[in-house]
Curated annotation (Swiss-Prot):
InterPro entries: UppP (IPR003824). One of its GO terms (molecular function) is undecaprenyl-diphosphatase activity. The keyword Glycosyltransferase does not apply. This is Undecaprenyl-diphosphatase. Keywords: Antibiotic resistance, Cell inner membrane, Cell membrane, Cell shape, Cell wall biogenesis/degradation, Hydrolase, Membrane, Peptidoglycan synthesis, Transmembrane, Transmembrane helix. Disulfide bonds: none annotated.
Amino acid sequence: MSDMHSLLIAAILGVVEGLTEFLPVSSTGHMIIVGHLLGFEGDTAKTFEVVIQLGSILAVVVMFWRRLFGLIGIHFGRPLQREGESKGRLTLIHILLGMIPAVVLGLVFHDTIKSLFNPINVMYALVVGGLLLIAAECLKPKEPRASGLDDMTYRQAFMIGCFQCLALWPGFSRSGATISGGMLMGVSRYAASEFSFLLAVPMMMGATVLDLYKSWSFLTAADIPMFAVGFVTAFVVALIAIKTFLQLIKRISFIPFAIYRFVVAAAVYVVFF
């Protein structure tokens, strides 16, 4: 593979990762399809995917840095307010409660979960995750009990964490599981989305560091330019995607995302079967 070709592949996959990581459409499903079509598979490809996820995580940190520091008691002047945010009553305990279920299951069944990374499992997860999005829109309370992040209860945070366990199924979508769970628990669509992004930082960081540690032997000096391009591309695209997504969900439901998931599932079937 030539240097220019590998850098082009890195940029393409960085765009795919950045666009899909925080949308309820399954970044895993997209990365499997695009990686297969580009002929970029194997141990190096898996390590590459782990590295560029860090770029997506950094985008969330940049977007929500004030809120993230506020969770640990560090405040920088007067907080900037956005719709869905308020005065700092969301605490680190909410985040920890949202993490516990998936962390426990993820650590206990890490190797088993990794063995599920294949097209057939991803295809089914795309469909089931789409059905959950539709269920969340249809069954959510007419008036949310938590319209903003700071209205959320500990119980709601923990239940969202339980829904997050569904994302251990490759292709399900972590954001899809947590946002759907939040809506079913009476959290507004906007607040559930923001909580999902905040929850992503420790969850994805922990999972990525663990995967990177286990994949370190596949990383060589020659891969650094390619990995750097993918990382930066994923960061920039994820930043744009998050901002756009938070504006979009003020106007539309998640039904279009569910339909899109079904289309991607069909694409997985066509490409691999």
